[in-house]
Each structure stands twice: as C-alpha cells, then as structure tokens.
Amino acid sequence: MIETELGQLRRSHYSNDLNASMDGTQVTVMGWVLTVRGHGNISFATVRDKNGDLSIVAKKGDCPDEIREKISSLKAHSSIGVTGTIKASEKAPSGFEIIPTELRVFSEVTTIPPFEPTAKTVKNIDTRLEVRPIDLRRNILQHVFKTRSLVLKTIRDYFNDQNFVEINTPKMIATATEGGAALFPIFYYNKEAFLAQSPQLYKEQLTMSFEKVFEIAPIFRAEPSRTNRHLAEAISIDLEEAFVDYNDVMSRIEEIIKVSIIAVNDYIKNNPDSEFTPTP
C-alpha cells in the first residue's frame, strides 16, 4: 500500500534503536531517501533519519510489487515513511535490512539538488545556503551541530551542579549604556532602542540577589569587519559570581573548558564516523 499522507502512521523506532537481534520485528521508520538502486526484481533504498541510515530492500515475492516499483523510482531527498519487518543480513551495512509492507511518500523530489548529501565538502557557500536544510543533512555538519548541542548541555549541567541560577536578560535596551562595541539601533514602538551586546550590567545586579548566575544567549555587535568569519550575532556564555575574585573566576572558566573537552572527546570516541580529532 502506498499513501502520501501521514494520517495515523507514527514512527516506532529511530535507526539507532534497531539491530539484527530484532529479526522478525515489525517497525515503522521515517526519513529522507539517501540513495536508490535497482537490479531486476529487487530495489534497494537507503533512508537517513537524524541518527543514521537504514537499508530498505524490496524484493519480488517479499513485498507488494507496487512498493518495489515505487521505491525504484524515488529520487534522493524524498521524504518517506516505511513500515516493514526487520531481517538480519550480514551483507547490510548495519547487519539488518527492512522488508517493506507499507510505504508512504510524504514529499517527492522534482529537482535534484546541486550536491549529494554524502559530499564531505561543497565549495560554493551560495549553493549551500540555497538548499541549507539538505546541506545540513551531510554527515560532517550533523556531527558539528550535535557536538555544539552537547557542549552547551555540558556547560549548562556544570552551572546547575554548582548551584548557579540561569537568567534571561533583556535583548532590547533603551540606551547605549554598555560601551565598547557599536550597537545595532532598532525602532521599538516608534522609539529608538538597541540590541544588547552584553548582559554584564544585568548580571552584576542579579548577583546581589542570587550570588551565582549564568546566561547562554545571543549577543549583537555592530562592528564592521572585512572577514566573512566575523559574527555580528553570536551565542555568549556569561557567568557572574559574588564574593569571589579574578582568580576564582579564572578557575571556574578552566573547569568549564575541561568538562567541555571531556564531553567532546567522549563523543568522538562513541562516533568515529565524525572524523573529529580528540584533544589530548
């Protein structure tokens, strides 16, 4: 059966939840088509979800002909849902494959993107930005974003373990009182305002109430630059602590860097396909 609507169908497993020991188990998976190939009475498709790749094998006699024929006609990047049975297979990259019994094609590609999701590098940044969601499906960028998320979680966990209070300070301010970097002016209810370039003043005041505070949030700096690596908008990790001196703060920052490096090294160890180099 082939349908195009999600309906009541829901994913039962992600790719990393499945293994060969589940032989004979019925599952429902969803993702984007990575590759498709056919050989006579058999069609193969690799489907990628957020955690990895899945092998879909449609063989004449094992699944409905309409599903086998539809899989062979799919183009890369089409989004699909597949219900089928796990079959252990030494030939499959993950040790198993899925024999489909139901296929749903949620969206089918009509124009082939200018690069493959398996590409390690794409030189033209404009090309990448035109199809950014597809660009971000590339393995290296998946690991970059997951590592970034891990580092932010690790830092937030550290602050929580040390009894810091997380705060959220205003990002639109009435006056340019922070000094230093140039500010972005904006109109706020027909009055001039600015995007905040630092939470420093708010942090200092809040330590008089909570002693230990931190914030992970955007900052904005209107500084002209001739390099394309300069960020006018960035994520800042700020902390403030009462009753300590400069050396205490530096020790705190060193601890944050240490726990972050440990977390990243563990990630690299558990994900060798990231091709990242661990820090000694």
Q: Which residue stretches match the model-derived regions?
A:
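Class II aminoacyl-tRNA synthetase catalytic cores and aaRS-like
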Residues: 1-280
